[in-house]
Regions:
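Short, flexible, mixed-charge acidic loops at enzyme active sites
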Residues: 6-13
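Active-site glycine/GP-rich loop and adjacent strand/helix microenvironment
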Residues: 14-183
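Hydrophobic alpha-helical hairpins/lids featuring a short glycine-rich hinge
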Residues: 1-2
Length: 183
């Protein structure tokens, strides 16, 4: 990396949306203090990003016994949020962590409710779980995700094979949501 990339800032502002965009690429043990100080001074209401990057900063905060900045929520996306990561992130930021699941093509979107259950959002897309021959599978059986986007007006995706495998389940939920549940 060039000398310029080894020193702050490792972020840029999106003034139109009042966002601070921090580089995951430049996160290193020696740079974490800069990230911490910038986050603390910016005081975001929400922290949104890769679980691995947020976890790395959270671990630094916990292990260094830093003062806590408490956002309203931490939202993770684009990677699997592992239980040990969630625990450290919650400990560092003293707030709930909401995980999201989707794809760049905007073919589908899912998120966790406050009870930790991952729901697809039917206003966003139509989801099917199919076998290798594109036949629909009943709830509880794992198969390939096929999605029809209801929001991408630029490039409509109809029965788009996402490449992910999962199952949907029928479940009585505390949250009383009727949205499909990922099993």
């Amino acid at each position: 990396a060039s000398e310029k990339q080894r020193k702050p800032p490792f972020w840029r502002y999106d003034l139109a949306q009042n966002n601070l965009l921090m580089s995951s690429h430049h996160m290193s043990e020696s740079n974490l203090p800069f990230y911490y100080e910038k986050l603390k001074s910016f005081k975001p209401k929400e922290i949104f990003g890769y679980p691995s990057s947020i976890y790395r900063l959270a671990r630094y905060i916990v292990e260094s016994d830093k003062d806590r900045y408490i956002p309203n929520v931490v939202i993770t996306t684009a990677e699997t949020l592992l239980p040990y990561q969630r625990k450290v992130i919650e400990e560092a930021f003293l707030c709930s962590v909401v995980d999201q699941y989707g794809c760049t093509e905007m073919a589908f979107f899912a998120s966790q409710c406050r009870y930790g259950v991952m729901h697809f959002h039917p206003e966003h897309s139509i989801i099917e779980i199919v076998d290798a021959n594109s036949n629909p599978l009943p709830n509880g059986e794992p198969g390939e995700v096929v999605a029809t986007s209801l929001i991408n007006k630029v490039m409509p995706l109809i029965r788009y094979r996402v490449g992910d495998r999962l199952s949907l389940v029928d479940r009585a939920l505390k949250c009383h949501s009727y949205f499909p549940v990922i099993g």
